[in-house]
Amino acid sequence: MIKTVVSTYGEFIGEVDEGADVVVIKKPKMVIQSEKGFGFAKGVCVTSVSEPEEVTIQKANVVMVVDTNPEVLKAYEE
């Protein structure tokens, strides 16, 4: 299921799989904000490959996992 993950590193959208100690996000997109609204970064950090297959975040660094706004979900799927 596609979810929004807010971590100490930033906000991500993707297919979430929660383990005991980690959250794995498949097809992750990092959310970025500008004066014109929101968008998606090309990678998940400055030096990552563009559009990585997945990212693993330690649960200690996850602030929350929530349902994604339908409009944002539509933009993610495009």
What do the PLM-derived regions correspond to, one by one?
Residues 1-78:
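Conserved RNA-binding domains used in RNP assembly and mRNA/RNA metabolism
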